[in-house]
Amino acid sequence: MRRRLARIALIAIIVFGLGFGVNFYLNNYTGDGKGTPEEVLPVDRDYVWIDGPISEKAQRYFFFADGKYFGTALLTKNYKGWSDELSTSSLLPSTLAENKIAAAYSDSEILFGLIKASGEVKVTVNNHESKRIPLAELSKVAVELYNVQGYEIWYVDLAKLKEPKSYLIKVLDKNDSLLNELSI
């Protein structure tokens, strides 16, 4: 009886070890394996890339593509090199009114969108202030093609939000007065 239990335990340990090994291999030794994040970025469309948040193991880019799309791509680094892990895009919203949020997008890790900020405003999601990236660095050709003069990208890490099922996005002025809100 004891030998039977020992064999069952040994088999369970071997199966667990194999599962762990396969998971470790797939997470750390698969993917594109490029030397830099820029080498991994897709080139199948006419992209305009905008640097987003960066860490030692991940780099996020926002992008405009083909004159009508807006999205984000997440690149990750493992032992093999940099790989494209996740990307999402949607149609670029039509011209935005000042200090209005028309739409929000998500790739299950961040919530992001565009705003045409006028004056000192902040964008909050569930009372958590978002980070913003001004599009002033874009070339004049890109600004005209995508009609994003004066726009900024706002984003918030979903892991920092307490209630991930619903989001209340607010645009507040410098006195924290509500200018616009969107609930999703």
Locate predicted features.
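Short, Lys/Arg-enriched, disordered terminal segments
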Residues: 1-10, 31-36, 173, 177, ...
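Hydrophobic membrane-insertion alpha-helices, especially the h-region
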Residues: 6-24
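N-terminal export/targeting and maturation segments
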Residues: 19-93
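Short proline/glycine-enriched turn/loop motifs at strand-loop junctions of beta-rich domains
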Residues: 115-121
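Short, surface-exposed beta-strand/loop "edge" segments at domain boundaries and coil↔beta transitions
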Residues: 67-74, 93-95, 121-122, 163, ...
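Ser/Thr-rich low-complexity repeats and stalk/linker segments
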Residues: 45, 123-184
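Structural signature of eukaryotic scaffold interfaces centered on beta-propeller domains
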Residues: 51-55, 104, 161
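Extracellular ectodomain segments of secreted/surface proteins
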Residues: 88-112
